Structure formats: C-alpha cells, structure tokens
Design a protein with these regions (language model features):
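Conserved active-site tyrosine of GNAT-family acetyltransferases
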Residues: 138, 143
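Conserved acetyl-CoA pyrophosphate-binding loop and the N-cap/start of the following alpha-helix
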Residues: 98, 102-110
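Acetyl-CoA-dependent GNAT
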Residues: 3-91, 95-97, 114, 145-154
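Conserved beta-strand-loop-alpha-helix junction that forms the acyl-donor binding cleft
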Residues: 99, 125-134, 151-155
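Conserved GNAT acetyl-CoA-binding A-motif
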Residues: 87, 108, 116-126, 149
Length: 155
C-alpha cells in the first residue's frame, strides 16, 4: 500500500530540478515548443502555477511512499481550481522501478479520497498521447476523454 505525504521544501526543489526539463522535452516531442525555447517556457509555466513554491495556495504536492518501509516511490500534484469544486492533476510520476505493481492506481485512489475531503466533485488531468501506460491507468480508474488536441505535420 502507498500513502500520500505532503512534500517538503527540499523535495519540492528536487522535483522542480527534474520536472522542468522533463516537461520541456514532452512539449518539444509533442510539437508544441521548439527546443530553443522549451526550457525557458517550462520554467515560466512552473513559476506561474506555483508562485509560492510548495506552499502555493490551493496546490497539493505529495510524495508517494510505501507504507511498509516509508520508501519514496513518486510524487503527485493536484490543484483545487477555485471556485469550482474541481481538482486538476498537474503532475504524477512513479519511479520506473515501481511501475506495474499497482502503486499508481493506489496513489490515484488515495488522491481521490483526499479530493473528496476537500469536497471536490471532479478531477481532471492531461496526458500526452504517447503515454499509453498512463492512459490505460486513467481509463481503468474511470477517467474519460473530454477533449483532444490533434496535430498534422506539414512537409
């Protein structure tokens, strides 16, 4: 079993160090950003979303840890989209060695319980089309596609 524990400032800084280049690379791969601008755009996106860092209002950043030994195996970040009773998952990552063991599903279910405690009625998220494992997880948990972006490369 896993549990969600609020992220510390140190964990948040480590998360940013890893997530900013990952988010930049995902947007380059999806064709949204050029490589030249990607890192700066990613930095700005995180700064805008989390102006007070880990203490940013209505944002909930958790480390995912195993209950039996306290090992940190990932993280998840949800924002309450005030004033709506809606949460949005901005980031969710499990260590590669911990994938395929049911921990992702457990973490998502734990986050759903937390969202219910906040009296949220819905949770949304974005997933890149090439992340088929994540899409399978989300669909299995009852998430539905509400919109899609489509791109055609012109040669």
């Amino acid at each position: 079993m896993v549990r969600l524990v609020p992220m510390t400032e140190t964990e948040f800084e480590a998360h940013l160090e890893k997530s900013i280049p990952e988010y930049a690379a995902e947007n380059v791969a999806a064709g949204y950003w050029s490589e030249e601008e990607a890192l700066e755009r990613s930095r700005k996106a995180f700064a805008n979303l989390l102006p007070q860092g880990v203490k940013s209002e209505n944002n909930y950043l958790f480390r995912i840890q195993l209950e039996e030994n306290g090992e940190k195996i990932g993280m998840i970040w949800m924002k309450h989209e005030v004033p709506r009773p809606h949460g949005f998952i901005y980031d969710f990552a499990l260590d590669e060695t911990q994938r395929g063991k049911g921990y992702g599903k457990q973490a998502m279910l734990a986050l759903e319980e937390f969202a219910k405690e906040l009296d949220l009625k819905t949770i949304g998220l974005h997933v890149f089309a090439n992340n088929t494992a994540a899409m399978k997880l989300y669909k299995g948990l009852g998430y539905e596609v509400t919109s899609q972006n489509m791109t055609k490369k012109l040669v």
